[in-house]
A protein has these predicted regions:
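Small/aliphatic-rich secondary-structure junction motif
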Residues: 1-56, 152-209, 228-232, 288-289, ...
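Structural beta-alpha unit
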Residues: 1-2, 43, 57, 75-113, ...
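General small-molecule cofactor/ligand-binding pocket signal
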Residues: 37-39, 86-92, 140, 187-189, ...
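Short glycine-rich, flexible loops that bind phosphorylated cofactors or substrates
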Residues: 16, 121-122, 162, 246, ...
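Conserved N-terminal ligand/cofactor-binding loop architecture of enzyme catalytic domains
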Residues: 43, 49-52, 56-68, 75-77
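A short acidic, glycine-rich active-site loop
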Residues: 56-69, 206-218
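Gly/Ser-rich helix-loop-strand patches that form or flank binding pockets
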Residues: 3, 26-30, 99-149, 254-308
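Structured core of small recognition/catalytic domains
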Residues: 181-263
Length: 313
């Protein structure tokens, strides 16, 4: 686990930016953040040579105008009272926003990338999935809504080392919130299933479900014993997935319990592969049109093949 000291926020000059800036402000003041870097990518346009000759600084002027516009919105929605947090704004030019975001994240050794999820844009998860697979740091996906607190965090766990990392990150956020006078609750949620072929055991479906739950509770005790909870209370939750849809169970429980953020562990990347395997359930959570922020926590790596990978995006 590593603290979120450097945060990169991807803006797109739409109404979504207000929610992103507001959430970035909340995140920065509830983590050990030292800097927040806002970036926006303006689409490259092929201008006729005559127009370029007449207005040689047209694109530069557009970039400066965009930067001034973003500065105004950021001042309105980002809490600047903590002068120790450095705020930077960059406006880039290109046709693939995700590529520029990834390059900036690598260049500035970013710990977490924050991106938005629009309500009305059903295909917005395509860019987000690209970032989730290829970013060398954690990714926070923020739906288009207003945020005022984060007092209930759900960590989806399968008791793996990735889940342990996700829980530790949630503990950091909860600890900061507690110090600020907030009552933050962490729910460690495990979804279990009855395996195919259960009938060969001679037990009924419900009996096998009971066995799986007992086993999950045993695994949880072994899992939580290795975690430094920093005095934060962790509440275990065990849910039985009867319809072969783990993601639906996670999300429905999160809605029922009024969860402010779902945290899940993502895998790291080996030097021999071009993509980060984020896991089937993580990918389905990204694709789902949720109203709850999703934080994908992954180990931070710098690989020799990174630049080659970026060229393929």
């Amino acid at each position: 686990m590593y603290p979120f000291k450097k945060i990169l926020v991807a803006l797109d000059a739409t109404s979504m930016d207000e929610a992103l800036i507001q959430f970035a402000s909340f995140l920065a003041h509830n983590t050990p953040a030292e800097s927040v870097h806002f970036v926006n990518v303006i689409k490259s346009t092929q201008l006729p040579s005559s127009l370029k000759k007449e207005f040689p600084n047209l694109m530069e002027a557009a970039i400066q105008d965009r930067k001034k516009m973003l500065e105004k919105i950021i001042i309105e929605h980002f809490d600047m009272t903590n002068h120790e947090i450095k705020v930077k704004i960059s406006v880039e030019q290109g046709n693939l926003p995700s590529k520029h975001v990834l390059k900036l994240a690598e260049k500035h050794n970013i710990d977490a990338i924050v991106v938005g999820r629009k309500k009305k844009l059903k295909n917005s998860s395509v860019v987000t999935q690209r970032l989730a697979r290829r970013a060398t740091c954690s990714l926070l996906i923020v739906p288009e809504k207003e945020y005022t607190n984060m007092n209930r965090i759900m960590v989806a766990t399968d008791f793996s080392k990735e889940s342990a990392t996700a829980l530790q990150e949630a503990i950091v956020v909860a600890e900061r919130g507690t110090h600020a006078g907030q009552d933050v609750e962490i729910i460690c949620h495990h979804v279990y299933q009855v395996p195919i072929g259960y009938h060969y055991t001679g037990k009924s479906y419900d009996e096998c479900g009971d066995v799986m739950q007992k086993n999950a509770k045993k695994q949880y005790r072994a899992f939580i014993d290795k975690i430094d909870t920093q005095g934060i209370e962790i509440k275990p939750l065990f849910s039985w997935d009867r319809n072969d849809n783990v993601v639906a169970v996670i999300y429905e429980k999160a809605l029922q319990m009024d969860v402010n953020c779902i945290v899940i562990g993502g895998k790291g990347k080996s030097a021999s592969t071009d993509f980060f395997p984020i896991g089937t359930n993580t990918e389905r959570l990204i694709s789902r049109d949720t109203e709850i922020p999703l934080l994908i926590v992954r180990p931070k790596h710098v690989n020799a093949g990174l630049m080659e990978m970026l060229q393929k995006i």
